[in-house]
């Protein structure tokens, strides 16, 4: 039986007759307990238990020490299906629904306890309080700040403050969702957010509640919100607007949920998020970086983090002021997150150096990691900095363990107790007869590996890695990565370079064989992981040859285990790009420019000399597509329309999804590569985005015959009105014709001369604006355009009369949409202008059908604007009163009846009811239009 199977069976056996109370009390088995039962090394048992967690067979409970329980046992005792998204939990009590932690009473204001509450966080805390208290259900919030600045912690403090203030009930849910996990799978994203119905897609074996449902009555924290694709943002703001949703595959009834959203991003929200989504998140809160915090706050943060480490060690720390100085000025690219990592490294060094001391762990300059120590020693500002820090700490400061209550508790990031790990390894290595010096060197290099690997797990950067791994190790690791990919026929992501380079670096610095596996276990590893072992042997030869060191067999076994453990890691999949153009080097030149400027991308060039046959081109493009496809499809940028005709044949031949854009230019290639590398969009979204961005370039191309076509917009000043008119005309043109038509704006001053110059180059289809130039083309005045008839005239001028628009609203009314949306975007906070306009246009069509009238655009705009703001006032709870003192006549009563009856379905759709007085105002507009009077 394999080692992993022995461990799994032992774990199951330990709980086969256990009760739920017993399980909740002991929370599973630790790796040490299983190791003692099976007489194996604890590190090997821990390794296999984590493999079982990854394979969804065992649950990890992140207590101290970490404990494990088989999924099968948990499902049996809890009498419910275990959610496979929850393979690592903090406490089994939470799953039982009886968590004391979730229902505790919070007696102290959690926000005021934060370091910087009266300093750098004062404004952020004030904003958070205002957002929580805002009636009726609080304002959604967006937290802005660099990586590691504490956005997640701040979101959790807001949640605790809401409970403390009795805005949320004790035990209200606080759900965290990282948008980066599902950015490239809209269907799975929809399922995660809103749940799904059994059978709604492949793999949906049962009904599942989404996060919106789980967060009902509480807070949903959405981290890395900039990674949420546009489709996901639209799903979300529809829910924010209406409060209702359907599970995926469900249509029979609407579900409702009351959720306060807290979003977080490191990016500029105006460029990373849809404007329509941003309007739904009215409260933006900036979380300061470490650099933006005062020295006093940075000292307090360092003291707090040292106190947390003292709690984990269960001893007092004696910290020299130079250690404070070095730590406070060591965190550059990681903010508070890196400061925490550095504090852990210093404490680990100090712990190892003071293993034989019972009371106090001394932290001095000797305990600083080399990179921090070198930076500290090379600084010319040390005396000045130490003097400033001495105002807050003594030359030597005694720090006692900090025992937090739930209102101040920071989640532990590491799934193991670092100091327990050090003690375990020291004991093991002492049994092997190693000297204290060798043990220290071995332990410290491995501690760096553990702490640094956690800190950098989200974003690999070579420059960061170079601070603690030699460049020649990184270069060798890159070669080994290529070998592993070829031998194992799989693709590793960049983290492979990180983990393997750290391991090799640790081995080279240890310089001695550390053998803690017995013969039986090494034989099992060889037999179980044959392919990985073969690759590890190749690695051995390469490393020996390059670094001129001997690699013992036990190190090959460790390499085998490492390769196996990271084999499943994958790089984020991206859309591939093919640039195909006629000529000997046209496509290659464009691709070369793009890769040089924007870095590595799944892109390939296909140069097509004019002598190459179509069948050869097809084969060549198909082969290149297979090379660049990462499973997300391929965008094909071509120079001629004839190549675009190959799309369906290529899809059939390769099985790869393809989108094609013609008239490729270097600028277009750069735009596509930028979007693939940095925006995390799917194939369809990138295709649409590139097409949209370059349509203006195509429109500037001259017509195939005769002059270019144009509409001329005439305004008095050529400023704001001209821009709005240009936007409206652009929309009309896009709806009416695929032919490039230019929109030219001129001032009514010197109009005659301007028109003469335009006529030399353009065929003027129509003029629109404040003054008629009296030329041989139809003119549409602003009044006619706004009233509604002008839109029809312009479309007829464009199409030479071939389009006949209906008078109803089933056809999109461009003028009404443009003018209303422009205003509503500025002033609506809670409602989605686009959806509101669609809904109200549909409603007004019903009203017109019922009354047998056709309202002009001025009336439509007036009613839409008033009704949209009336719905907004319902949310804000400040409706306006109808103050007319005269008696309401029969005509107005009739309009009130029509208004109430026709508007009712839309009120139900939004879950909002407009007041009777607001409806009187709307009815009065109808009465004036139909009967010519109000009373």
Swiss-Prot record:
Family of the protein in this entry: Belongs to the transcriptional antiterminator BglG family.
Pfam families per record: EIIA-man (PF03610), PRD (PF00874), Sigma54_activat (PF00158)
EC numbers on record: 2.7.1.-
Domain PTS EIIA type-4, residue spans: 574-711
Source lineage: Bacteria, Bacillati, Bacillota, Bacilli, Bacillales
Organism the protein comes from: Bacillus subtilis (strain 168)
GO molecular function: ATP binding; ATP hydrolysis activity; cis-regulatory region sequence-specific DNA binding; DNA-binding transcription activator activity; kinase activity; RNA binding
Free-text note regarding domains: The PTS EIIA type-4 domain may serve a regulatory function, through its phosphorylation activity.
SS bond partners: none
UniProt name for this protein: Transcriptional regulatory protein LevR
Functional summary from the UniProt entry: Involved in positive regulation of the levanase operon which comprises the levDEFG genes for a fructose PTS system, and sacA for levanase.
Magnesium in keyword set: no
């Amino acid at each position: 039986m394999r080692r992993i199977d022995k461990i799994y069976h032992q774990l199951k056996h330990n709980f086969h007759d256990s009760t739920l109370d017993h399980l909740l009390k002991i929370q599973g088995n630790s790796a040490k307990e299983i190791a003692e039962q099976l007489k194996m090394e604890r590190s090997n048992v821990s390794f296999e238990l984590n493999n079982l967690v990854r394979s969804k067979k065992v649950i990890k409970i992140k207590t101290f020490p970490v404990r494990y329980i088989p999924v099968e046992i948990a499902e049996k005792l809890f009498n419910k299906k275990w959610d496979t998204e929850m393979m690592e939990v903090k406490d089994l009590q939470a799953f039982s629904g009886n968590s004391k932690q979730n229902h505790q009473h919070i007696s102290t204001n959690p926000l005021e306890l934060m370091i910087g509450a009266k300093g750098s966080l004062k404004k952020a805390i004030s904003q958070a309080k205002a957002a929580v208290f805002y009636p009726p259900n609080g304002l959604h919030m967006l937290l802005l700040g660099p990586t590691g600045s504490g956005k997640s912690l701040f979101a959790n403090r807001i949640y605790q403050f809401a409970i403390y203030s009795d805005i949320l009930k004790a035990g209200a849910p606080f759900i965290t969702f990282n948008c980066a996990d599902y950015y490239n799978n809209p269907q799975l994203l929809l399922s995660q957010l809103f749940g799904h119905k059994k059978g709604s897609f492949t793999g949906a074996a049962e009904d599942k509640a989404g996060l919106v449902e789980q967060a009902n009555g509480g807070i949903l924290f959405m981290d890395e919100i900039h990674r949420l694709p546009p489709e996901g943002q639209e799903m979300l703001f529809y829910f924010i607007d209406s409060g209702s949703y359907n599970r995926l595959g469900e249509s029979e009834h609407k579900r409702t949920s009351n959720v306060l959203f807290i979003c977080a991003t490191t990016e500029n929200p105006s460029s990373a998020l849809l404007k329509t989504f941003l309007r739904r998140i009215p409260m933006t809160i900036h979380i300061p970086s470490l650099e933006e915090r005062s020295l006093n706050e940075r000292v307090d943060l360092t003291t707090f983090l040292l106190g947390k480490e003292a709690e984990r060690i269960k001893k007092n720390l004696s910290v020299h002021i130079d250690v404070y100085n070095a730590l406070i000025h060591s965190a550059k690219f990681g903010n508070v997150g890196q400061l925490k990592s550095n504090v852990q490294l210093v404490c680990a060094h100090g712990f190892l150096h003071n293993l034989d001391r019972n009371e106090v762990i001394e932290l001095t300059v000797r305990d600083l990691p080399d990179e921090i120590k070198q930076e500290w020693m090379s600084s010319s500002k040390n005396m000045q900095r130490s003097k400033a820090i001495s105002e807050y700490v003594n030359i030597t400061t005694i720090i006692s363990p900090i025992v937090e209550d739930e209102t101040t508790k920071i989640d532990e990031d590491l799934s193991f107790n670092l100091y327990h790990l050090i003690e375990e390894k020291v004991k093991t290595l002492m049994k092997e007869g190693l000297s204290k010096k060798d043990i220290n060197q071995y332990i410290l290099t491995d501690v760096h590996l553990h702490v640094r690997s956690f800190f950098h797990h989200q974003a690999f950067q070579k420059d960061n890695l170079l601070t603690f791994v030699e460049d020649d190790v990184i270069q060798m690791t890159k070669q080994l990565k290529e070998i592993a990919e070829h031998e194992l026929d799989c693709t590793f992501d960049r983290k492979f370079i990180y983990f393997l380079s750290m391991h090799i670096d640790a081995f080279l610095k240890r310089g001695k064989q550390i053998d803690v596996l017995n013969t039986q276990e090494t034989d099992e590893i060889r037999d179980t992981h044959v392919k990985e072992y073969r690759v590890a042997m190749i690695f051995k030869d390469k490393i020996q040859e390059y670094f001129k060191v001997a690699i013992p067999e036990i190190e090959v076994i460790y390499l085998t285990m490492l390769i196996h453990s990271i084999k499943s890691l994958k790089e984020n999949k991206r859309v591939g790009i093919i640039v195909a153009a006629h000529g000997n080097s046209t496509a290659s030149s464009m691709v070369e420019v793009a890769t040089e400027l924007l870095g590595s991308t799944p892109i390939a060039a296909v140069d097509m000399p004019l002598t190459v046959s179509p069948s050869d081109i097809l084969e060549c493009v198909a082969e290149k597509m297979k090379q660049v496809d990462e499973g997300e499809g391929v965008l094909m940028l071509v120079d001629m329309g004839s190549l675009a005709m190959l799309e369906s044949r290529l899809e059939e031949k390769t099985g790869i999804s393809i989108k094609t854009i013609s008239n490729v230019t270097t600028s277009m290639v750069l735009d596509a590569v930028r979007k693939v590398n940095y925006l995390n969009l799917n194939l369809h979204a990138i295709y649409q985005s590139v097409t949209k961005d370059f349509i203006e370039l195509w429109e500037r191309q001259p017509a195939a015959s005769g002059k270019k076509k144009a509409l001329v917009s005439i305004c008095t000043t050529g400023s704001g009105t001209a821009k709005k008119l240009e936007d409206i005309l652009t929309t009309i043109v896009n709806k009416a014709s695929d032919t490039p038509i230019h929109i030219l704006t001129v001032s009514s001053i010197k109009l005659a001369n301007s028109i003469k110059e335009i006529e030399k180059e353009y065929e003027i289809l129509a003029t629109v604006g404040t003054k008629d130039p009296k030329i041989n083309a139809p003119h549409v005045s602003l009044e006619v355009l706004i009233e509604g008839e002008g839109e029809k005239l312009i479309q007829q001028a464009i199409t030479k009369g071939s389009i006949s628009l209906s008078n109803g609203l089933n056809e999109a009314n461009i003028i009404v949409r443009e003018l209303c949306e422009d205003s509503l975007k500025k002033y609506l906070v809670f409602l989605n202008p686009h959806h509101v306009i669609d809904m109200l246009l549909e409603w007004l069509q019903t009203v017109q059908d019922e009354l047998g009238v056709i309202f002009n655009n001025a009336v439509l705009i007036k009613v839409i604007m008033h009704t949209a703001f009336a719905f907004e006032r319902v949310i804000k709870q400040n409706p306006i009163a109808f103050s007319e003192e005269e008696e309401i006549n029969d005509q107005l009563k009739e309009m009130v009846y029509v208004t109430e009856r026709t508007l009712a379905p839309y009120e139900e759709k939004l879950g909002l009811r407009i007041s009777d007085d607001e409806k009187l105002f709307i009815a009065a507009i109808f009465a004036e239009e139909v009967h010519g009077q109000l009373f």
